[in-house]
């Protein structure tokens, strides 16, 4: 059983026993005090210890000091002339304060569940191959270059590359995406994913501390250090508020009795009101519930594949009015695909076959798109005399035929005219031309595909009150215009260098409303300067990207732009709950403070205004998970 809960139960029993002794044993008041000190010290020794430690450190003003002062005063007030003993209330107040602390601990544990569950992505062991045997060791003991084996049902222990095997990986703990990811030999995999089917042999590419799982866990744990404006204000407020409360309580106890005929009896009455005032004034509900709300909100977002580096970035997300998108890799997939094949005097299959073989050894993204469209490399074709002309294309001898694959410039160099193609009229991607033995043979259309949820993402942002969506790209104006039209962004700027993007963001920052914030959304790899300059830097598709995790303030672990609106909604909900708690706690406390000052509030009501309000506020904070 929880030690604090056991103390609460024993104290309640001893308190009942002390009450019976007080009423039926006929003891003197000082003897009754000694009886009540047993349950009081049992339940309050740690609070008293913290209060004394604060005094010794010359920093006494906290909730422990307020509770110690109020309850000690309640224990002693009965010895004043004309005062009623308040032994039961003194122990009762401390008992309920500890009950509130117990509930706070429980709520914090529940809020940490999101983080604890996130810890489940951390593998316990790695099966490393050593001297022809497999040994289970701690992931921290594995070095870069070691070979590890991952069986079905096990977690990927460290980031690496598959040497052997095919499988499906469950990435839900990292991305929030339930659809498994298929992997095969040569694919890069990251730690924290669960291997669902086949046995995999991996070459370790990163040490444990540099692997994705460890970095994500560290990021979420560190998020608590970046306080929101509300959290920072509450902490500053509490440091000023508590001394003012103590001084006000002293004034309430000492000054009003001067206006009575007899000071001593009046002092006992006003001292009780001052002690009640102290109990009500304890700022627990504010100091505990508001940071807990943000902690729960950050933990809940992490379960949806959204890593927010602190409450301050939740503040900024909630006030977004301008969002600037990079185009490639953010609104589009960032990978070229063959869209259509338009042959001239040959079949589509033959044209694609020849182009793919000519580009077999090129590392250009367009060459990769052609090879992916025709993956049958091992078809016994003879490829000789490969020659690449910078800025034009590639030529090679394929099965005895000279095949040239490139742009308009290459065709002009060959002295070939390019026929007008009516089907290419509205195409804004790349057109790759093919010539065979000096004769024009057709062209292949290649483009970067728009993400499926890009339009929905922009529409959702407008619904949430984002008034300006801007797209920046280094691509050509025609391509930018088409993506802007298809997604619905309000403005776009094309043919920009990285420095131009920073300048555009600077201009947008100077133009924005003071109450609104600006976010830049990119891939986190090539956009670090812009991500750093924006009020909020959002990196998309950051799974496995160290650069993205370091550069951004908010990290979307998959590549869905629609998750930006989800991040905004979660942030706004978290802040709304924090404000709810603040206003609820303040309004109840002000009401009971007035009642206490006028003599209409007992310590029992004061306990509710403190512990009861804290419990309700903490329960409300848990909604942010």
Regions found by a protein language model. Give the residues of each.
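Residue-level signature of catalytic and energy-coupling elements of molecular machines
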Residues: 51, 86, 107, 126, ...
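N-terminal membrane topogenic signal
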Residues: 1-10, 241
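Actuator/coupling domain of P-type ATPases
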Residues: 19-22, 36-125, 129, 133, ...
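Conserved catalytic phosphorylation-site environment of P-type ATPases
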Residues: 56, 63-68, 174, 272, ...
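Membrane-embedded alpha-helical bundles of multi-pass transporters
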Residues: 17-27, 50-59, 73-83, 300, ...
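Conserved ATP-binding TGD loop and adjacent catalytic N/P-domain core of P-type ATPases
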Residues: 400, 430, 436-580
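P-type ATPase nucleotide-binding
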Residues: 338-468, 477, 486-505
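Bilayer-spanning, highly hydrophobic alpha-helical transmembrane segments
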Residues: 12-13, 232-261, 274-294, 579-608
């Amino acid at each position: 059983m929880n030690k604090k809960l056991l103390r609460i139960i024993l104290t309640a029993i001893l308190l009942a026993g002390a009450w019976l002794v007080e009423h039926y044993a006929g003891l003197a008041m000082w003897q009754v005090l000694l009886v009540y000190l047993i349950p009081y010290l049992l339940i309050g020794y740690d609070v008293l210890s913290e209060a004394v430690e604060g005094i010794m450190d010359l920093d006494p003003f906290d909730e422990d000091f307020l509770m110690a002062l109020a309850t000690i005063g309640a224990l002693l007030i009965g010895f004043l002339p004309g005062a009623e003993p308040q032994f039961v209330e003194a122990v009762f107040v401390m008992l309920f304060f500890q009950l509130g602390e117990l509930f706070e601990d429980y709520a914090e544990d529940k809020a940490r569940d999101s983080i604890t569950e996130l810890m489940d992505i951390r593998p316990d062991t790695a099966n490393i191959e050593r001297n022809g045997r497999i040994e289970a060791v701690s992931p921290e003991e594995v070095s870069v270059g070691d070979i590890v084996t991952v069986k079905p049902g096990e977690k990927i222990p460290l980031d690496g590359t598959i040497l052997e095997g095919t499988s499906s990986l469950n990435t839900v703990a990292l991305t929030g995406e339930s659809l498994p990811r298929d992997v095969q030999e040569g694919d890069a995999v990251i730690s924290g994913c669960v291997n669902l089917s086949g046995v995999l042999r991996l070459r370790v590419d990163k040490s444990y501390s540099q692997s994705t799982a460890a970095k994500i866990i560290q990021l979420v744990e560190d998020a608590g250090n970046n306080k929101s404006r509300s959290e920072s204000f509450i902490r500053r407020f509490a440091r000023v508020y508590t001394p003012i409360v103590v001084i006000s309580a002293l004034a309430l106890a000492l000054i009003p009795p001067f206006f009575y005929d007899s000071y001593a009896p009046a002092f006992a009455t006003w001292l009780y009101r001052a002690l009640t005032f102290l109990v009500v004034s304890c700022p627990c509900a504010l100091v505990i519930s508001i940071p807990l709300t943000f902690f729960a909100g950050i933990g809940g977002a992490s379960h949806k594949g959204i890593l927010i580096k602190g409450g301050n970035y939740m503040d900024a997300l909630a006030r977004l009015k301008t969002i600037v998108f990079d185009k490639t890799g953010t609104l589009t997939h960032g990978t070229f695909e063959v869209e259509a094949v338009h042959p001239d005097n040959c079949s589509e299959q033959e044209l694609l076959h020849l182009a793919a073989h000519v580009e077999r050894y090129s590392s250009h993204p367009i060459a990769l798109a052609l090879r992916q469209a025709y993956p049958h490399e091992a078809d016994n074709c003879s490829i000789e005399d490969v020659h690449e002309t910078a800025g034009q294309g590639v030529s090679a001898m394929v099965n005895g035929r000279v095949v040239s694959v490139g742009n308009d410039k290459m065709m002009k160099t060959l002295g070939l005219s390019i026929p007008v193609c009516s089907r290419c009229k509205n195409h804004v991607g790349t057109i790759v031309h093919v010539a065979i033995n000096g004769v024009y043979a057709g062209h292949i259309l290649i483009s970067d595909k728009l993400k499926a949820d890009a339009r929905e993402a922009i529409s959702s942002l407008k619904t949430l009150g984002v008034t300006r969506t801007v797209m920046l790209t280094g691509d050509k104006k025609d391509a930018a215009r088409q993506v802007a039209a298809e997604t619905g962004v309000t403005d776009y700027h094309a043919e920009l260098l990285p420095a131009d993007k920073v300048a555009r963001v600077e201009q947008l920052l100077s133009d924005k409303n003071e109450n609104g914030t600006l976010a830049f959304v990119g891939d986190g790899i090539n956009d670090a300067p812009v991500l750093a300059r924006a009020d909020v830097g959002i990196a998309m598709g950051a799974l496995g990207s160290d650069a993205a995790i370091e550069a951004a303030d908010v990290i979307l672990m998959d590549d869905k732009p629609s998750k930006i609106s989800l991040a905004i909604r979660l942030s706004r909900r978290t802040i709304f709950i924090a404000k709810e708690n603040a206003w609820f706690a303040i309004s109840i406390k002000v009401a009971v403070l007035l009642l206490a000052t006028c003599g209409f509030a007992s310590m029992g009501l004061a306990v509710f205004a403190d512990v009861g309000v804290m419990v309700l506020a903490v329960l409300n904070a848990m909604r942010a998970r």
